[in-house]
């Protein structure tokens, strides 16, 4: 084979390789462009509509004070309502609230009747194919509640040998049973049929400490007699929900939540509505 023939063959082999690889490169380029457009919001029609129309539509079940309810004047009020209003203010748009029964919230969201759900929502792992969830803005996990004079109780290990009140069958009851079974915690479990009953037991000195969720704790702890031990023993985040085709919208929500955590806005809401 002559030198020219060899060079011609090498060029031919290179061209074959190029034609084999070029389609793959084009496919990868198109996929990357698609991701970029998605990330830049070109495919988030919800965020685009909010910006163009100047209206954020928020769905909530307005029957859960102090997070959301309708007052005597017919106005939406509460912790979550303030979140929705602050989002709208941050984005320079108006906010319209819709009162929807809790069981119908996700249907309304998927039917595009609302843009976001802000309604003391727990993170539901079974819905993540259709729903995008924000970062947590409130932890409703289980907490210890103690009389002020029991300040030595600072963690769950400190209830060893103590009388602990829980609501019968509630998550706190299950948590305490698990701790006694798996970690060998020794405590006398006293049950009540409702939250008011176990708080009465604590206030009357019949138990040393109680465990309940953080929302219930704030509802019943008033004045100086009782104290909530922070941080919570478990994590039960409240989150904001958007449709799966609204990635830019939920990203903007997450940025707002991060800013609120840094500025103390969420602490202010807890102080206003819960404490």
Language model segments and positions:
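Bilobed "Venus flytrap"/periplasmic-binding protein-like clamshell domains
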Residues: 57-66, 74-89, 121-122, 143-197, ...
């Amino acid at each position: 084979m002559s030198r020219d023939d060899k060079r011609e063959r090498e060029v031919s082999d290179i061209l074959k390789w190029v034609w084999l690889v070029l389609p793959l490169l084009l496919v990868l380029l198109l996929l990357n462009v698609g991701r970029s457009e998605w990330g830049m919001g070109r495919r988030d029609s919800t965020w685009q509509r909010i910006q163009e129309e100047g209206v954020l539509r928020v769905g909530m079940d307005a029957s859960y004070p102090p997070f959301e309810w309708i007052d005597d004047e017919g106005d939406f009020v509460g912790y979550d309502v303030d979140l929705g209003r602050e989002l709208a203010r941050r984005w320079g748009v108006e906010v319209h609230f819709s009162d929807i029964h809790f069981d119908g919230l996700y249907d309304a969201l998927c039917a595009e009747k609302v843009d976001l759900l802000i309604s003391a929502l727990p993170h539901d792992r079974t819905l993540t194919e259709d729903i995008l969830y924000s970062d947590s803005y409130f932890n409703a996990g289980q907490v210890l509640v103690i009389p002020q004079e029991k300040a030595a109780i600072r963690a769950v290990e400190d209830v060893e040998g103590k009388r602990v009140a829980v609501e019968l069958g509630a998550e706190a009851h299950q948590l305490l049973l698990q701790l006694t079974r798996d970690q060998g915690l020794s405590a006398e479990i006293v049950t009540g049929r409702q939250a008011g009953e176990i708080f009465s037991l604590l206030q009357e000195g019949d138990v040393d400490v109680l465990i309940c969720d953080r929302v219930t704790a704030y509802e019943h702890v008033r004045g100086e007699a009782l104290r909530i031990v922070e941080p919570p023993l478990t994590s039960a985040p409240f989150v904001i929900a958007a449709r799966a085709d609204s990635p830019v919208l939920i990203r903007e929500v997450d940025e707002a939540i991060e800013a609120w955590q840094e500025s103390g806005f969420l602490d202010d809401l807890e102080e206003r509505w819960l404490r």
